Amino acid sequence: RDILAREFEQKYGAKLLMIYAWPSQQLFCNLGDKSIKSYPLSKLKGKKIRTYSTTLGDFIEGVGGSAVTIAFAEVVPALQKGVADCGLTGILPAYNAKWWQVVTHNIRVKLGYASSFLAMNLKVWNGLDSDTKAFFNKHLADLEEEMWAATAKNDEIGTKCNAAGPCPKGEPGGMVPIIPTAEDKATLKNVVENFVLKRWAKRCGTQKCVDEWNETIGKISGMKASL
């Protein structure tokens, strides 16, 4: 977080105030047959998969799929018409947007949490008095904690609502859940290290950037980025 705060200030002239996230990003596929109960990540090879970010696109290409950028509002007709075979989005947003009407399976590989942030113009922040800064810091920290708790709750709700329920938001979606196997987890680690992280490190561009990632997120995740 300290590294992000520094980059916000130096690159964008902004004060980072909050980091929060949307529900976990997962795969939703139209496999055509709900009797399918297992589906390894290796079978995604050749599939057209909706994405919305470079990093997720790297993952899709890493498993042999074809990344297709489609606006969220256009995903349902794209899945319905076969423009895409699968889509990536948050597990509760997928339910709310009725993806369950056009897909059969939810592959429960968590590919991140669509991180978001709240920031303020740094000059404006620096112009505030100490009491106002303290007010923002306290209440935004409280709000951030509440939002992370809400994300966890929404993950739980989305997991149930997309499958057989019970669903507090309406009709259960009836998707067939695909639970990652040990083989899938090994595939995921390989793809992250050899596609996602390698390409990210190249975009990041400096050894300092890569080293800072390795010293923070890398230590927690047990993975290492390299240029």
Regions found by a protein language model. Give the residues of each.
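N-terminal secretory/targeting leader peptides
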Residues: 10, 14-227
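A gly/proline- and charged-residue-enriched helix-loop-helix capping module
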Residues: 1-11
